[in-house]
């Protein structure tokens, strides 16, 4: 294995692990019921905090893309990662709804969008020859993260309280981002893996680059926005409520609810990794069509 191959493999894993830290959001469902019981919050008010997070992730994604052109990747990831962990930590002191919305909804949401966007960008740019594979590996690692953290989070809540659980998640994320970010960097603009050559010009001559303004004027952009928004919302609803629904409607205890989050993570991870690799062979749109058809 060449040094260059080894290095991009390390960067891929570190970027994926940074993305996995943002997947702490996927264990939100184990916090909802304890949070309501601790402070008397209504289910609607607690659920709206997650809605704010998702909105902020969508709005901050373009900011992350802009920052990638202005500062080194490891600096952006470190700063945004610390902000992400700080949001979780401060949520441990959120005894009122406004504080919950600011610390968790706004701070965690904005920093999550920046970190998530950057993690995937780093992963795929180091693998121009296997973009689907790199994207699949990164997303799979992010997806299986709750398999380990959901039971641990539930154990902390049961042995201490929900506030301390938020504090611990926050500190863990801050330390994780600081350590992992040190290994991140973007490849040079002309980077290409050893033994791989970009497609001939004749194969890519129909590709056209758009500015942000031009992109917003195309019907294709709005079609994709509606499509991806619908798919993402479906997944987010499942992720944010799987434990709570199991406890409230199926009578599960907290430990079983956390186990459900883990099972969901396994299925999610296998799908992301497999479909990412398949898309390199079958094509992006064809794979997407099959995946959505099966899900529906």
Functional labels for PLM-detected ranges:
Residues 20, 87, 98-114, 229:
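Hydrophobic core of transmembrane alpha-helices in multi-pass small-molecule transporters
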Residues 26, 54-62, 146-147, 265-273:
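Residue-level signature of mid-helix packing/kink "hotspots" within the transmembrane helices
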Residues 28-35, 210-277:
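Extracytoplasmic gate region of multi-pass secondary transporters
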Residues 59-98, 279-285:
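Conserved MFS/SLC helix-loop-helix module at the cytosolic interface between two early adjacent transmembrane helices
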Residues 10-43, 60-64, 149-150, 230-231, ...:
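Extracytoplasmic
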Residues 35, 105, 113-127, 134-135, ...:
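Intracellular juxtamembrane helix-capping segments at the cytosolic ends
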Residues 186-209:
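Flexible cytoplasmic inter-helical loops of multi-pass small-molecule transporters
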Residues 137-191:
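Helix-loop-helix hairpin linking two adjacent transmembrane segments in secondary transporters
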């Amino acid at each position: 294995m060449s040094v260059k191959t080894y290095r991009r493999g390390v960067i891929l894993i570190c970027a994926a692990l940074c993305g996995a830290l943002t997947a702490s959001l996927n264990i939100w469902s184990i916090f909802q019921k304890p949070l309501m019981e601790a402070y008397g919050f209504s289910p609607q008010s607690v659920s709206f905090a997650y809605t704010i997070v998702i909105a902020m992730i969508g709005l901050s994604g373009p900011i992350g893309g802009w920052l990638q052109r202005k500062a080194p990747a490891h600096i952006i990831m470190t700063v945004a990662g610390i902000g992400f962990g700080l949001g979780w930590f401060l949520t441990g002191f959120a005894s009122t709804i406004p504080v919950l919305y600011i610390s968790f909804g706004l701070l965690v949401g904005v920093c999550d969008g920046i970190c998530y966007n950057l993690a995937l960008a780093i992963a795929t740019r180091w693998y121009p020859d296997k973009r689907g594979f790199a994207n699949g590996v990164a997303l799979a690692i992010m997806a299986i993260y709750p398999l380990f953290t959901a039971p641990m989070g539930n154990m902390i809540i049961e042995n201490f309280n929900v506030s301390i659980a938020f504090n611990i998640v926050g500190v863990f994320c801050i330390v994780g981002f600081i350590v992992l970010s040190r290994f991140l960097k973007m490849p040079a603009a002309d980077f290409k893996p050893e033994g791989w050559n970009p497609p001939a010009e004749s194969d890519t001559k129909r590709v056209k680059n758009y500015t942000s303004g031009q992109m917003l004027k195309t019907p294709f952009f709005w079609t994709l926005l509606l499509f991806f928004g619908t798919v993402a919302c479906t997944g987010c609803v499942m992720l944010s409520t799987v434990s709570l629904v199991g406890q409230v409607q199926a009578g599960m205890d907290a430990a079983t609810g956390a186990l459900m989050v883990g099972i969901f993570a396994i299925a999610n991870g296998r799908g992301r990794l497999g479909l990412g690799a398949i898309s390199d062979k079958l094509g992006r749109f064809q794979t997407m069509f099959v995946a959505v058809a099966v899900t529906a």
